[in-house]
Swiss-Prot record:
This is GTPase Era. GTP binds at residues 16-23, 63-67, 125-128. GO terms for molecular function: GTP binding; GTPase activity; ribosomal small subunit binding; small ribosomal subunit rRNA binding. Residues 125-128 are annotated as: G4. One of its GO terms (biological process) is ribosomal small subunit assembly. Residues 8-176 form the Era-type G domain. It comes from Azotobacter vinelandii (strain DJ / ATCC BAA-1303). It is a peripheral membrane protein. Residues 16-23 are annotated as: G1.
Length: 300
């Protein structure tokens, strides 16, 4: 076999309900933090590529928003449409499910998978938390009945358990072909996008259930000056009360958000970062398709 014929390359969609561990799985496969994570469902809002090149194999993972039943706002419709679109024209699908729990939103994903032509791998997450692995068998058997042609792999996205098996199965299902991206490229997203996502992650982690989903981040300025990367980020909310929550008493909360986001950016960009944050009220942005488009929520 020639060197050209030994190359494998393809797209791998990572799908599942919200908050099941898709972004954590991508980060562990890549060996670095790329996709933002939090305990809040629907943290991921956009499809994002995570590219892993290892020898002759280039796997292009597509991290997707969690498919969910809520469809009442333009933002929810955008996320569901984005996740569904990822199932088209990919070479492999990884369906991430919980080790025991099955919900209506898992079923929603399963229903979409009936139309997928390519191979499906079912990654059963948090399997390492069960002391007696026999408890897992009924769930694995049920999953095998639902997806009889799928390979089922118990994993831990957080701790990396059995991910080598999952990656090996992915590699064996990718088509032969030249690599689409340079060996050292790990994503298709810009540095501005990654910076905005880091700020949004810190907001979601700081506020937990205090703040609804109507918050987004826009990078207004991003430039390197000497050894320092200067970033100006605008945090958009829908109501004055939400603005006060983010700022916090005497500005303490937004200060913590800024400190944590800056630290993450310095690791990601390997540069000293000067980060400035502002909070602005933009009423109704999450249910305004034109506003969403202007904020970067565009169809793939």
């Amino acid at each position: 076999m020639t060197e050209e014929n030994s190359l494998r390359c393809g797209y791998v969609a990572i799908v599942g309900r919200p908050n099941v561990g898709k972004s954590t799985l991508l980060n562990h496969i890549l060996g670095q933090k790329l996709a933002i994570t939090s305990r809040k469902p629907q943290t991921t809002r956009h499809n994002m590529l995570g590219i892993k090149t290892e020898g002759d194999v280039q796997a292009i993972y597509v991290d997707t928003p969690g498919l969910h039943k809520q469809n009442d706002k333009a933002l929810n419709r955008y996320m569901n449409k984005t996740a569904s679109a990822a199932l088209k024209d990919v070479d492999v699908v990884i369906f991430v499910v919980d080790r025991m729990r099955w919900t209506e939103e898992d079923q929603l994903v399963l229903d979409r998978l009936q139309y997928v032509q390519g191979p499906v791998l079912v990654a059963v997450n948090k399997a390492d938390r069960l002391e007696d692995k026999v408890e897992l068998l009924p769930h694995l058997q049920w999953l095998a009945q639902q997806l009889p042609n799928a390979e089922i792999v118990p994993i831990s996205a957080l701790h990396g358990h059995n991910l080598d098996t999952l990656e090996r199965l992915v590699a064996g299902r990718l088509p032969q072909g030249e690599h689409f991206f340079p060996e050292d490229q790990i994503t298709d997203r810009s540095s501005r996008f990654l910076a905005a996502e880091l700020v949004r992650e810190k907001i979601m982690r700081q506020l937990g259930a205090e703040l609804p989903y109507q918050v987004t981040v826009e990078i207004e300025d991003f430039k390197q000056q000497g050894q320092v990367l200067h970033i100006h980020a605008l945090i958009l909310v829908e109501r004055e009360g939400q603005k006060k929550i983010i700022i916090g008493e005497k500005g303490e909360r937004i200060k913590r958000i800024g400190q944590e986001a800056r630290q993450g950016m310095e690791v990601l960009f390997d540069s000293k970062v000067m980060l400035n944050l502002w909070v602005k009220v933009k009423g109704g942005w999450s249910d305004d398709e034109r506003a969403l488009h202007s904020l970067g929520y565009r169809d793939s």
